[in-house]
Amino acid sequence: MNTVASLFAILPYPQIDPIALSIGPVAIRWYGLAYVTGILIGWWLARRMIANLSLWPGNTTPITEKHLDDFLVWAAIGIVLGGRIGYILFYDLQPVLDNPLVALEIWRGGMSFHGGLTGATLAMIVFARRNGLPVWMLFDLVACVAPIGLFFGRIANFINGELWGRVSDVAWAMQFPTGGPFTRHPSQLYEAALEGLVLFVLLQVLARQFHALKTSGVISGVFICGYALARIFVEFFREPDEQLGYLVGGWLTMGMLLSLPMLALGLWAIWRARRAGRSQEPSGLKG
């Protein structure tokens, strides 16, 4: 056991340049590539899922590949705008008040999942209504592939050496470049595993083996609950943002506070879906 711990202990934090590629004066960062990669892989998988009609209610879906192609731009705008605005409002408003141009520096990081989810949700609602699509069906489709983007986003956080964990002496703790002289939990990797890999596998199993997409809203609810539970759990290992610290009692963080309403919303979505059974979407939620 001590030998295994020693092997982990000598593994340093991998110093990876945040800039993946430079073309003249243009620097392409891993952070931006993570968003693009997550969106494109999610789009590709979503196309395959709508082509598999056996997954959907009545073995048919009104969502076409053309709809997905058109929605790709809406999704990107909703995620980026919502993520950036959410981060500014929830985590770091003062620098933007001092210099509004800071809000445009997306390449430096500073994106909020909760804001990105809000932006993406608004984009889905508007897109569904404009195209006459059942909004819960679109929610479910996007939820099935969203963990892919979460996985790549957390890996990018790790490469950037940001959002590291609390001080720890566990065998796999790392000393991050901006984390001081202490070894810390690689909490970005915990989130990549739970919010990304585990949640993705869970949703795919529910959709493909248990036909959860046939009851609109179940997948959306499980995704929201799954993310909220994973985030609350990892927050116990993640260092809170320096400018905020702990909100209450040395344990409650902003990430926890924002995830608690998500958990309630996810449970409501599952309850609503189970109550509706296999009936059609409520008229108030149709596009």
Curated annotation (Swiss-Prot):
Q: What class of enzyme is it?
A: transferase
A GO term for molecular function = phosphatidylglycerol-prolipoprotein diacylglyceryl transferase activity
Q: Provide the family line.
A: Belongs to the Lgt family.
What the entry lists under PANTHER family is as follows:
PHOSPHATIDYLGLYCEROL--PROLIPOPROTEIN DIACYLGLYCERYL TRANSFERASE (PTHR30589:SF0), PROLIPOPROTEIN DIACYLGLYCERYL TRANSFERASE (PTHR30589)
Q: What is this protein called?
A: Phosphatidylglycerol--prolipoprotein diacylglyceryl transferase
Protein EC = 2.5.1.145
- Pathway it acts in? Protein modification; lipoprotein biosynthesis (diacylglyceryl transfer)
